[in-house]
Structures are given as C-alpha cells and as structure tokens.
Amino acid sequence: MEIHVYDIELSTRFRGITRRQGVLFEGPVGWAEWSPFPEYDDREAASWLRAAVEMATLGWPEPVRDEIPVNAIVPAIAPVAASERVRASGCLTAKVKVAERGQTLEEDVSRVAAVREELGPRGRLRVDANGGWSLDEAVVAIAELAQFDLEYAEQPCTSVEDLVELRSLLSRRGVAVPIAADESIRRVGDPLRVRDLGAADVAILKVQPLGGVRRCLELAEVLRMPVVVSSALETSVGLRAGVALAAALPELPYACGLETGSLLLDDVVTKPLRAQAGALSVTDLVVDPEALERTRAGDEMAGWWLERLHRVAALVPEWPQTTGMML
C-alpha cells in the first residue's frame, strides 16, 4: 500500500507557515490523512494517527444533516484583504485571527472592524488568539474588541487557569464576550478540566488532534457545552473527517471552522471541499491521482515524514492490525 507525502503552498501565511505537509494513504474503507504540525512531539502526533486509522478503516457515523454552515477564515492580514476574503467566501460568519506575533492590538482592531463592516450587523464574528495573549493583555484586548459584537473569543490565553480568571475579570467589567477553548481541550492531558473549572462557554473540537470522529462525539457528550467543529489546516481528505463529525453531532448551534481548504493553493481530490453559500455539503470525495503526483513532496521532506510516521506508528497499536501496513 502506497503512502503519499504531500507538500502544498498556502495562499497566505497562516499559523506562521507558508506551506502545509502531511501523509495520505488509502485503507479498507477510504482515504486518510495524517498531518500533525512539525513541532508536535511523537506522543501528541499519535492521537492524529489514531484519527487517520479511523478514517481508513471505520468510515463515518450516520449523519443527521446534509449541510454544514461554516465560517470564513481571516488570517492576520491587512483590513482591505480581510474584507475581500470574507466577501469572496459567501459566509455569514467569520473568524478573525488576532494576537499574531509581531502585530499590535491596533492592527487587530482595524482588521476586526473591517470584517464587521463587511459582514454587516447581522453577520456573526468571532476572533481567535491561539493563546497569544497574557491574562492582562486578553482583558484589555477583548474589552476593546467587544465593540464589534463578538460571538466569542477563542483561546485568548494559554492555560485553563487563565481562562477561568479571564471569564471572571470580564464579567466584573461588564464585558459580555463568551470564551471558547481550543488548545485547552486538544493539547492537554485532561480535556475535561475546561468543563470542571468553568473555563469556557464553547468547546472547539478538531478530529485529528483528538483521535477521531467517534472520540470527539464522546467528548462532546461529556463536555456538556456547545461545540464548534474546526479543522487542523488539512487537505479535503482531512477536512472530510471534520465534516463527518459536524454532520453527526445531535446539535450544531454555531457555524464550523471547516472552510480552511480555501487557504491551500492546491488539493488532492477532484472536487475540493469549499463553501458554497456559506456551507459545506456532506458528500464523498474522490482522490485525484494527478493531484497526488502534482502535490508530492520532495525526497527530503518525504523522508522526514516517513521516518516520523515509523516512530509514531509504534505508539499506535491499531496501526498494523487495522490497516495491514507495517513500517
């Protein structure tokens, strides 16, 4: 069974990177993607591989909806470009990246203001700091950005404890902006601490980092808070797992963060998952052999990923038994 390592350029810098790489392979029931970010250690990357095994061998739970509303994704770009991106997306909800290293709060305010103007008063707007603010910075920034009627602020600070304190401080100041937890759920030993400590109002769930669609469904049930399904900047193969999760959740009160395929300048399927009128269809994908060849990583990059896969597979007992693949 062949393993494909892809290397695709991004349309703009995102999360500090300009290219996205990962591994694709076909299992008994379908194609799978494994694309943990390079800085993640092997143990963290193992959860991503468990998700890939699920994609390849189990398929998806029964959907309860055939369309997933999604948000436009706005990187830390200039206000004019931010407006253009939202307009082109056709989405009624937008997520704006803030707290980018090297940028100022004033730049964040200008970007968010431009997006709010583009969306109009009825559009929904959320910001994502990726833990980029200290507690004090988060209080000031969210109080300032609250003027734009935020749906929520995602992962303003890194630690769960800071999120708890932040919610308290904002409440005392009369700043009514809900807090969403992302990294505090997917990059910690106990994702339920967010629930137990009252650290967030909304849970962000990402399939690969959390070990698969079924694991996310179980987690959503015990977290007992509204859920937003987001992507990990994958190709359409990986995005399809996020769509499967969003389609299977009993309730879906928010637009999902699954429109990130628009950040890639290429893809590996015949019809990439892209929003139409602000939504993604729950549909099967066909991997394109020509696209696999076109996006194939160079030898050095491919070697790095295959060596990494070899190490991480040793931590995932399901790998050889369920895929029939020995590394």
Predicted segments, located by residue:
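N-terminal capping/lid subdomain adjacent to the active-site entrance of alpha/beta enzymes
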Residues: 1-147, 173, 269-327
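Conserved beta-strand segments of alpha/beta enzyme cores
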Residues: 2-4, 69, 178, 226, ...
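Conserved beta-strand termini and adjacent loop/short-helix elements that scaffold enzyme active sites
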Residues: 6-8, 73, 182, 230, ...
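Short, solvent-exposed coil/turn elements at secondary-structure transition points
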Residues: 8-11, 76, 185, 233, ...
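Conserved active-site loop/cleft motifs that coordinate metal ions or position small ligands
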Residues: 31, 229, 255-258, 281-282
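Hydrophobic beta-strand segments of well-ordered beta-sheets in folded domains
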Residues: 92-94, 202, 226-227, 253
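Catalytic core of soluble alpha/beta enzymes
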Residues: 101-244, 265-268, 273
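Short helix/strand-capping turn motifs
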Residues: 250-262
